[in-house]
Design a protein with these regions (language model features):
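N-terminal leader/linker segments that precede catalytic domains of diphosphate-processing enzymes
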Residues: 1-123, 127-294
């Protein structure tokens, strides 16, 4: 049976990726083991500034110097670190066991995924989904610029930062959305859980901290992204079709799923069934394409 191509789009499979797929199919190469990762689709009602805008999502453009997805526009996120599973990190919201049931994994893994999602989003956008109590939220992300850069510089762990500031993760703000696994043919693979979350009132997503604080910290950003922008999902998809931005398939599919929502509340009210989605590089003697899961 022939694997279907991605409907409505042309996905070019690089020659090296096609070669790896052929090697794996022939049994001469084993797929890389995917590393756990987490990402947050930050949402806000763009209509506040742009009448008729509806829901907008925050996208970062990865630098072209990176090995994985150079130049692609992605949601804030990254790999799970060992410290993300620390049970001492303050937690507010559904217990890890409840989130684990929705994610289809263990409580320990669910805790690490939520923590990684919040940590990476703070590192990459400056938005911190945490507060001093189960109902409070940080309302001035700019005030945490030096803490953000200390985290990026590795001079403080996320758990230490939250503990010193008296903050706890607001796990209740994260809505599980999807799970995507990098194709087996890729040399670097990730098992990534997607969450949706609202931009907290008073916080601003930014690629860098205020200049004077960034200079004091000796850093200018995460180093992985060179631009950040709020876009309506349909607007982002149209920009990708026009060749103005590059979207990885999981990002494009997620934006397509969000495009039918007109307010943030309707997105966050979703209770989605989370099942792994694994795109596949399909090859024959002369061609290669990406087959998408249903």
């Amino acid at each position: 049976m022939t694997e279907p191509r991605l409907a409505g789009a042309s996905i070019t499979v690089p020659g090296k990726l096609a070669d790896r797929a052929r090697e794996i199919a022939a049994g001469r190469l084993s797929p890389a083991v995917p590393r756990d990762a987490a990402t947050i689709v930050l949402l806000w009602p763009g209509v506040l500034l742009r009448p008729g805008a509806g829901v907008e999502a925050y996208l970062l453009r990865r630098t072209r110097a990176l090995d994985f997805a150079p130049g692609a526009c992605v949601f804030p996120g990254g790999s799970v670190d060992e410290g993300d599973a620390d049970p001492a990190i303050g937690w507010a919201g559904p217990p890890p066991a409840e989130i684990a049931d929705r994610l289809g994994t263990s409580p320990e893994r669910a805790r690490a995924l939520v923590c990684a999602a919040v940590r990476e989003t703070f590192e990459e956008s400056g938005v911190l989904l945490a507060g001093s109590s189960p109902t409070a939220l940080v309302d001035d992300s700019a005030a945490l610029a030096q803490d953000r850069h200390a985290l990026l510089a590795g001079t403080a762990s996320f758990g230490e930062l939250l503990g010193r500031l008296g903050l706890m993760l607001r796990a209740d703000l994260l809505t599980p959305w999807a799970r995507w696994i990098t194709p087996e043919a890729a040399p670097r693979r990730f098992d990534t859980w997607f969450f949706a979350a609202p931009l907290p009132p008073g916080q601003t997503a930014s690629l860098t901290a205020p200049a004077e604080q960034a200079e004091q910290a000796g850093q200018t950003g995460s180093g992985e992204s060179d631009a950040g922008i709020w876009l309506r999902p349909a607007e982002a998809l149209e920009s990708a079709r026009a060749g103005q931005i590059t979207l990885l398939p999981p990002t494009a599919v997620t934006l397509g799923e969000l495009a039918g929502h007109h307010d943030v509340a309707s997105v966050l009210a979703q209770r989605r069934v989370i099942t792994p989605r694994l795109p596949k590089v399909v090859v024959n003697d002369h061609d290669a394409w990406l087959a998408m899961p249903p």
